[in-house]
Structure formats: C-alpha cells, structure tokens
Regions:
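Donor-binding/catalytic cores of nucleotide-activated saccharide
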Residues: 1-86, 113-117
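Residues within HEAT/ARM-like alpha-solenoid scaffolds
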Residues: 72, 94-98, 124
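Hydrophobic core segments within long, regular secondary-structure runs in both alpha-
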Residues: 75-82, 104, 123-134
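Flexible helix-coil transition and linker loops at the boundaries of alpha-helical arrays
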Residues: 85-97
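P-loop NTPase catalytic cores that bind/hydrolyze ATP
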Residues: 94-117
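Basic, ligand-binding patches in group-transfer machinery
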Residues: 116-223
Length: 223
C-alpha cells in the first residue's frame, strides 16, 4: 500500500513511477515494483497507521469486494504487476511468492464473498477468477495453500458453486473451533467429512509456515 510510506523523490522520478488513474487499488502496480527496484528499504516497527473498518454506506474499497467493478480493477492491477515481472524479475522465488499472494490475499477477497452473492453472481465471479488463474498462475500453487483455501480454489476451478459456498460458510461459522490432532509427524485437522477428508486434511505445512514468532527488542545481562 502507498499510504504508510515515505518515498525519496529522486528515486520516484528516476524510475518514472506514476499511479494509474480512474482505477481502484492504484497503489499495487507501483509499490510492488518500487520494492523490487529499491536499493534499500527501512521499516519502522512502531504502529503509525491503523486500518479502520467503516460502518454505514461509506465503506473502504476492500470492504466493497462484492462490487464486480472492484474485482475487475483488482485483476487489472494484478496484470500490471504480472507485466512488470515478465519484463524485470528473474528470481523464481519472487514469482512463486507473487503467485501465492495473488491466491492467498488478492483473489480470495472476492472468492470469500460467495456467501453474500446470488447463485448467478457467484458463478459469474468464479468464471472471472478461474479465467485469470488459468491464464496466469501455475495450478500447482493451489496445492501449497492452507487446507480450506486450497479446497475453495478446487471448487472454484471446477465451477462447483454449491461446494464453494458450503466451504466458505463452514469457515465463517465453525473453522475457529477446529480440532487438530497429531498423527506421527503430521498435524491433521478434524474437519467434517462433508468438508475435507483423508490426506487433504493435513495441516502440517500450514502450521509450520505460520509458526508463531516474536521480535526481540532488548537483551540484558543480570548478575
């Protein structure tokens, strides 16, 4: 995002950055290339910005994800970043990170809205996202996602609207109460059989990826 950054004007001018106009999410196709091209980036640990969930009619663009113009604009700016990668980025690990982010964050915002849309609108949304994924993202990336994310994309790619809605509704209503058991070296989620079964419920990799960490700010020696 652009609203919590200070950018050197010399760096901005040298790389001819500019935000695209008349489109939502105009920060994405600028800030991602900006991080790639920068010689260094300084991060401030203190909280300097708080994102507010707005009530009423004046919602943020992220809260208006059921608007299809919003979704199409998001995919448009993702394509802008895709183009930058094609022209500039050689590191495969960055490509893999981009694919993962697109699925885990950027597109999932709209996938999750399936429970608020009519059947026809849900199917329309699924087709738009499916077309973009097939065009741009290696399908094996889906297998790297956490269990429910993976299963939602499998349903989407199969245009199985009823299963997608069932998965999302379970996630909203019951996922927070999921029990996880250890079997050997694996951690298995005890999902209802209608949601996830067998080896598909293996959550080991996801738990390893999101292992809790904490920053150390100070160390003192006590005699």
């Amino acid at each position: 995002t652009s609203w919590n950054k200070l950018i050197l004007k010399e760096f901005w001018d040298r790389n001819h950055f500019e935000f695209p106009e008349r489109i939502l999410y105009e920060d994405i196709p600028v800030t991602i290339p900006m991080h790639y091209l920068a010689n260094n980036v300084t991060m401030v640990q203190d909280v300097c910005y708080r994102w507010r969930i707005r009530d009423g009619a004046n919602k943020s663009i992220t809260q208006r994800a059921d608007d299809f113009t919003n979704m199409r604009d998001r995919i448009t700016v993702l394509r802008m970043v895709d183009k930058f990668f094609e022209e500039n980025v050689k590191e495969q690990e960055l490509w893999d990170a981009k694919y993962y982010k697109w699925l885990y964050i950027d597109l999932m915002i709209y996938v999750n809205n399936c429970i608020y849309l009519s059947d026809n609108r849900t199917l329309e949304m699924m087709k738009i996202i499916k077309d973009y994924i097939e065009e741009t993202i290696p399908l094996e990336t889906i297998d790297k996602l956490p269990v429910l994310y993976r299963e939602k994309y499998v349903a989407l790619m199969n245009l199985d609207e009823k299963r997608l809605v069932k998965l999302r509704q379970y996630e909203v209503d019951n996922y927070k109460n999921l029990k996880i058991v250890k079997k050997g070296n694996k951690y298995i989620g005890k999902f209802p059989k209608a949601i996830v079964t067998g080896d598909k419920a293996d959550m080991t990799e996801a738990l390893d990826q999101w292992r809790l960490t904490q920053l150390i700010y100070d160390v003192a020696w006590q005699k």
